[in-house]
Amino acid sequence: ISSSIFHLQTLITMSHFTKIKTKLYDRATIEKSLSDLNIEWESDLKKIKGYNNQEHEAEIIIRQKNNHDIGFKWNGTEYELVTDLMFWDQSHSVNKFLNSINQRYAFNLIAKVSEEQSFQYVEAKNQQDGSIKLLLRKFN
């Protein structure tokens, strides 16, 4: 699974908040993916803070130590990452952060859909190019 299958488009709003469009649409899979990556998150509609105490709503919140949080907000089609980039306080860049989430999301979504279609997960192998090779088996 290569994270390059996801295309990100950044939209700058009038405030300091940046919305980054994703192809993430299944909330439970996003939440599982964040947990798999040991990223602490909170659920339910809450407000995140940005520059000068500006606020923005999000359904999934990742708290940052600097009190300027990261959120995932449903836009009617998919979840957008919403944050004030001026206060980004993660160990990785925004792109690397999203690539990690996207890759884990794809892995979890494939596993979920495959199971629904009577496939059984056998193993996953990390490849040298950073992708993940999944082995699934059809069971009767």
Whereabouts are the PLM-identified features?
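Short, Lys/Arg-enriched N-terminal segments with co-localized hydrophobic residues
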Residues: I1-T13
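Interaction-mediating elements
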Residues: T10-N140
